[in-house]
């Protein structure tokens, strides 16, 4: 008796899964397209952030170099 119930449950579950997998291919394609578009945007934003960080670091180092030069000029004045 238990074997029949388990077999019935397996058949019912496989039927439900087969029905769900083929019903919304258009929606699945749309969602896949949206995910790919969002992944592209995330990669672009990540690249932009890395570029901005590099520019900020370069500006900081330039300011430090200018400060060192200013300090040298004040110490060597006669």
Swiss-Prot record:
Gene symbol? lpp
Residue positions where N6-murein peptidoglycan lysine is found in the record: 78
What Pfam families does the entry give? LPP
- Protein location: Cell outer membrane; Secreted, Cell wall
Which function does this protein serve? A highly abundant outer membrane lipoprotein that controls the distance between the inner and outer membranes. The only protein known to be covalently linked to the peptidoglycan network (PGN). Also non-covalently binds the PGN. The link between the cell outer membrane and PGN contributes to maintenance of the structural and functional integrity of the cell envelope, and maintains the correct distance between the PGN and the outer membrane.
In terms of superkingdom, the source organism counts as: Bacteria
Q: Which SUPFAM superfamilies match?
A: Outer membrane lipoprotein
Source organism (scientific name): Proteus mirabilis
Q: What is this protein called?
A: Major outer membrane lipoprotein Lpp
Q: Name one GO molecular function term.
A: peptidoglycan binding
């Amino acid at each position: 008796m238990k074997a029949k119930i388990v077999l019935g449950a397996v058949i019912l579950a496989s039927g439900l899964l087969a029905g769900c997998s083929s019903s919304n291919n258009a929606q699945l394609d749309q969602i896949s397209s949206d995910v790919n578009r969002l992944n592209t945007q995330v990669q672009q934003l990540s690249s932009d952030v890395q570029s901005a960080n590099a520019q900020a670091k370069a500006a900081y180092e330039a300011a430090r170099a200018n400060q060192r030069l200013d300090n040298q000029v004040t110490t060597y004045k006669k």
